[in-house]
């Protein structure tokens, strides 16, 4: 069971996924800080000194903090746009590599074809000797 787990855990795809999750979490924190500390304060200054973190409405002790929700929407939009652009660039690069791979397969030379025929004839001769 341990060997099966090691095979699963150390496959390229699983390790790649783990690295992606860690990088994604770090990127999410960076974007959250960007939105919270830079974008929404600048937007607040443009809108006349509005502090998005304090935007809320409520009744009594209950409050709906829609300012935080607006910041979370900005987080999502920036992360979604970044992932979209990354995937677009990645797909463009991988499609170019696939095109190059398809073009790289050369036709066999006359010598290679002749050597292949000689190999096949030798195999036939050896198999007929083994039968006899």
Curated annotation (Swiss-Prot):
What topology in the membrane does the UniProt record assign? Multi-pass membrane protein
InterPro entries, from UniProt? Mechanosensitive_channel_CS, MS_channel, MSC/AndL, MscL_channel
Q: Where are the transmembrane segments?
A: 14-34, 38-58, 67-87
Keywords for this protein: Cell membrane, Ion channel, Ion transport, Membrane, Transmembrane, Transmembrane helix, Transport
What SUPFAM superfamilies does this protein map onto? Gated mechanosensitive channel
**Which is an annotated GO molecular function term of this record?**
mechanosensitive monoatomic ion channel activity
Going by the entry's taxonomy, the superkingdom of the source organism is recorded as: Bacteria
Indicate the family of this protein.
Answer: Belongs to the MscL family.
Name the job this protein performs: Channel that opens in response to stretch forces in the membrane lipid bilayer. May participate in the regulation of osmotic pressure changes within the cell.
Q: Which PANTHER family match?
A: LARGE-CONDUCTANCE MECHANOSENSITIVE CHANNEL, MECHANOSENSITIVE CHANNEL MSCL
Q: What is this protein called?
A: Large-conductance mechanosensitive channel
Recall the taxonomic lineage recorded for the source organism: Bacteria, Bacillati, Bacillota, Bacilli, Bacillales
């Amino acid at each position: 069971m341990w060997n099966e787990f090691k095979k699963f855990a150390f496959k390229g795809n699983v390790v790649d996924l783990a690295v992606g999750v860690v990088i994604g979490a770090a990127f999410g924190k960076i974007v959250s800080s960007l939105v919270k500390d830079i974008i929404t304060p600048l937007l607040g200054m443009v809108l006349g000194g509005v502090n998005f973190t304090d935007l809320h409405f409520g009744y009594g002790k209950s409050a709906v903090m829609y300012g935080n929700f607006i910041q979370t929407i900005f987080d999502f939009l920036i992360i979604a746009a970044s992932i979209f652009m990354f995937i677009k660039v990645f797909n463009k690069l991988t499609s170019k590599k696939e095109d190059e791979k398809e073009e790289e397969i050369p036709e066999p030379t006359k010598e290679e074809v002749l050597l292949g025929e000689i190999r096949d004839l030798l195999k036939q001769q050896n198999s007929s000797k083994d039968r006899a």
